[in-house]
């Protein structure tokens, strides 16, 4: 299936000069959505990724991470923006183009030595994925890979990620 044909391009969003890759058109297509999850799971099996948990980055990582965890027989753990989780958290601050941001995960969600796959809809510069990886490693977990639906290759996000398998289904 041609996933690119299910992803809508929106020029000048959210600001002039940006070409936004809109996945809502992929999500509404029942065959495309099923294929996306099945294909991502297949790539994880092919890479022999033995995982305990899929971590989904807020918020579109939740959309793909939860069904992927189900397909892989793993648990799902959300990584959220600061202040969104009700219990005690591990947190990490990271640099953005114009400031900083913070990611959090519940303290009781991950245990040291857990094997983790990080999933999101898209990798651009790699900042959020890299911060999530550092958070996982701070806790003492083993990062076994990343899974992305879309990779914007020109932004070279993967060069900021640890040396583990990186799966991307569609490249621009």
UniProtKB/Swiss-Prot annotation:
Q: What are the subcellular locations of this protein?
A: Cytoplasm
Q: Which top EC class applies here? A: transferase
What one GO molecular function would you report for this record? AMP binding
Q: What pathway does this protein act in?
A: Purine metabolism; AMP biosynthesis via salvage pathway; AMP from adenine: step 1/1
The terms describing its cellular component in GO are: cytoplasm
Record keywords, A-Z = Cytoplasm, Glycosyltransferase, Purine salvage, Transferase
> What domain of life is recorded for the organism?
Bacteria
Instruction: Summarize the protein's role.
Output: Catalyzes a salvage reaction resulting in the formation of AMP, that is energically less costly than de novo synthesis.
Q: Per its UniProt record, what PANTHER family does this chain match?
A: ADENINE PHOSPHORIBOSYLTRANSFERASE (PTHR32315:SF3)
Q: State the similarity comment.
A: Belongs to the purine/pyrimidine phosphoribosyltransferase family.
Quaternary organization: Homodimer.
- NCBIfam families xrefs: apt (TIGR01090), PRK02304.1-3 (NF002634), PRK02304.1-5 (NF002636)
- Protein name according to UniProt: Adenine phosphoribosyltransferase
Lineage, opening ranks: Bacteria, Bacillati, Cyanobacteriota, Cyanophyceae, Nostocales
């Amino acid at each position: 299936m041609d996933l690119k044909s299910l992803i809508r391009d929106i020029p000048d969003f959210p600001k002039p000069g940006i070409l936004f890759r809109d996945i809502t058109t992929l999500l509404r297509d029942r065959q495309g959505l099923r294929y996306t999850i099945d294909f991502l799971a297949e790539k994880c099996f092919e890479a022999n990724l033995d995982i305990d948990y899929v971590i989904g980055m807020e918020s579109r990582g939740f959309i793909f991470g939860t069904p992927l965890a189900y397909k892989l027989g793993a648990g799902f753990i959300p990584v959220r923006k600061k202040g969104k989780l009700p219990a005690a958290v591990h947190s990490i601050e990271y640099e953005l183009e114009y400031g900083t941001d913070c990611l959090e995960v519940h303290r009781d969600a991950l245990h040291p030595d857990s094997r983790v796959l990080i999933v999101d809809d898209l990798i651009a510069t790699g900042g959020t994925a890299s911060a999530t990886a550092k958070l996982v490693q701070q806790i003492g977990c083993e990062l076994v890979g990343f899974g992305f639906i879309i990779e914007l290759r020109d932004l070279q996000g993967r060069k900021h990620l640890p040396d583990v398998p990186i799966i991307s289904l569609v490249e621009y």
